[in-house]
Amino acid sequence: MDPKAFVSGMAALGAGIAALACIGAGIGTGNATGKAVEGVSRQPEASGKIMSTLVIGSAFSEATAIYGLIIALFLIFKI
């Protein structure tokens, strides 16, 4: 097997694995949002605190997805 083709194949495989971070972040954000909506429906007076915590948690979750996307792009374009 050509070494250059092997490296390209492994880079594509690594990019696919790194892109899985986006799936995990999406699932996590969806679960957190669902639980926040349940919490607000149970206790409407705490909606401000629940929503601020949700926004901070979602930011951290989406940061993981962005890091995975950046790594995948680096592997695809071999920067």
From Swiss-Prot:
The keyword Membrane applies. The record marks E62 as: Reversibly protonated during proton transport. It comes from the Bacteria. Keywords: ATP synthesis, Cell membrane, CF(0), Hydrogen ion transport, Ion transport, Lipid-binding, Membrane, Transmembrane, Transmembrane helix, Transport. Gene3D superfamilies: F1F0 ATP synthase subunit C. GO terms for biological process: proton motive force-driven ATP synthesis. Signal peptide: none annotated. Its main location: membrane. GO terms for molecular function: lipid binding; proton-transporting ATP synthase activity, rotational mechanism. It is found in: Cell membrane. The chain crosses the membrane at residues 7-27, 56-76. GO terms for cellular component: plasma membrane; proton-transporting ATP synthase complex; proton-transporting two-sector ATPase complex, proton-transporting domain. SUPFAM superfamilies: F1F0 ATP synthase subunit C. It is a multi-pass membrane protein. F(1)F(0) ATP synthase produces ATP from ADP in the presence of a proton or sodium gradient. F-type ATPases consist of two structural domains, F(1) containing the extramembraneous catalytic core and F(0) containing the membrane proton channel, linked together by a central stalk and a peripheral stalk. During catalysis, ATP synthesis in the catalytic domain of F(1) is coupled via a rotary mechanism of the central stalk subunits to proton translocation. F-type ATPases have 2 components, F(1) - the catalytic core - and F(0) - the membrane proton channel. F(1) has five subunits: alpha(3), beta(3), gamma(1), delta(1), epsilon(1). F(0) has three main subunits: a(1), b(2) and c(10-14). The alpha and beta chains form an alternating ring which encloses part of the gamma chain. F(1) is attached to F(0) by a central stalk formed by the gamma and epsilon chains, while a peripheral stalk is formed by the delta and b chains. Belongs to the ATPase C chain family. This is ATP synthase subunit c. The gene is atpE.
